[in-house]
Amino acid sequence: MKVQVEELSPIEKKLSIEVDNARVAEELSRAYSNLGRQVRLPGFRQGKVPRRILEQRFRDQVEDEVIQRVVQSAYVEAIREHNVEVVATPQVTNSGLKPNTPFTFEARVEVKPKVEAKDYVELPLTKSDTAVTDEQVNEQLERMRQSMARLEPVTDRDTAASGDYVTVDFDATVDGQPFAGSKAEGITVQVQPGELVESKIAALEGVKVGESKDIDYAFPQEYRVEEVRGKTARFHITLKGVQKEIVPELNDDFAKQSGVAQSIDELRTKLREDMEKARKSQVEGEEREALMKALLERNTFDVPRAMVERAMDSMLRGALQQLQRSGVDPRQLNLDFNRLREDMREKALQEVKGTLLFESIAQKEGIQASDADVDARIEQLANEAGQPVAVVQKYFKGADERLGLSLRLREEKTIEFLRSRAKYS
């Protein structure tokens, strides 16, 4: 087999490949033999159909299959032999099969660019404080109190007051016509200023249980139900009950109810630790972005479209999975997934370039993640998840999963190296 590699650009190559006739003839012979064992033709016993008859009837089909096999195997051999780092499916053109003639084809491929990072010492960074104040801990405790509040019926009055939670039935129309979700019973809303679609209706203040009130509401342009976007609806709302919010006191019982700690002091300590960990992660993310931005300003190069498209797909999957983890079904949001994905293009481009620059710096500086590093991270992940190490190890048992973790650790080490050489302000 003969292979000629031509560089069309730093991100595209053309492989011209010639496969000798003997190899093609062997593939043809194997294909006709397999076909002969399977095909049934009148006048011939199965497995005894002469090849010339098979050629007359099935030549085009057999040659197409042989071309596909020869192209696939020869292409894989060629990129391995010449160390071509392909990032997308090749565009192939071929000469077709001709008797006693070598088979030739060309494959145009997008390739991973060879990036040589420069000017990566003394990148500008802003010093950030990861400390958590007592005030921030208290604010988080208050949020926890509010989230653990319960509702109790109001017994000393039957009129809704500001801040109350009320149970209502409603029936709504737009231009006199109902719409999707326009009718509901037993819905709880709060009597306070805000958006009706956020379950806040200040206009119910002063309404008595059993009374009804008509309220006009203009839906936002981005509302999830397309038929009422930007339109004004009339809601006929009937008050069914009044409740008040009971917020628990900050004491040991509250800590136990949270399921996090056995005392309020222990809860404060754990909250501070979690908040400091979250703040540290936030700062690290911000510094990674700042380092990447500075590197991209100092290093200009092109990347294959396929790498960007793949990054866009990954980012979209991540965004949708985050919604699902938050208990939101993306399918219920009427999202334009194509537009959402396209909006990620610039971010994906920067991410691909930044990752390549981090890889280049790691290679130049001899930064690696050892097997011991990978094992230590797996143990850390297991401890954080409260799972046995063996369970988490199973997830990283595959070569691809372990390699992915190793590359992530190498990038973390590279970023730490850049931080140690950065110029802080």
Curated annotation (Swiss-Prot):
The signal peptide annotation in the UniProt record is none
A Gene Ontology annotation in the biological process aspect, one of them, is: protein unfolding
Cellular compartments annotated? Cytoplasm
Question: Which Enzyme Commission number(s) are listed?
Answer: 5.2.1.8
Task: Give an example GO cellular component term for this record.
Answer: cytoplasm
Gene3D superfamilies attached here? 3.10.50.40, Trigger factor ribosome-binding domain, Trigger factor, C-terminal domain
Q: Which GO terms describe its molecular function?
A: peptidyl-prolyl cis-trans isomerase activity; protein folding chaperone; ribosome binding
Matching entries from InterPro entries are given as: PPIase_dom_sf (IPR046357), PPIase_FKBP_dom (IPR001179), Trig_fac (IPR005215), Trigger_fac_C (IPR008880), Trigger_fac_C_sf (IPR037041), Trigger_fac_ribosome-bd_bac (IPR008881), Trigger_fac_ribosome-bd_sf (IPR036611), Trigger_fact/SurA_dom_sf (IPR027304)
User: Which keywords does this chain's UniProt record carry?
Assistant: Cell cycle, Cell division, Chaperone, Cytoplasm, Isomerase, Rotamase
Q: Which reaction does it catalyse?
A: [protein]-peptidylproline (omega=180) = [protein]-peptidylproline (omega=0)
Annotated ranges, domain PPIase FKBP-type:
163-248
Belongs to which family? Belongs to the FKBP-type PPIase family. Tig subfamily.
Q: What does this protein do?
A: Involved in protein export. Acts as a chaperone by maintaining the newly synthesized protein in an open conformation. Functions as a peptidyl-prolyl cis-trans isomerase.
Protein name as annotated: Trigger factor
Q: Give the species.
A: Myxococcus xanthus (strain DK1622)
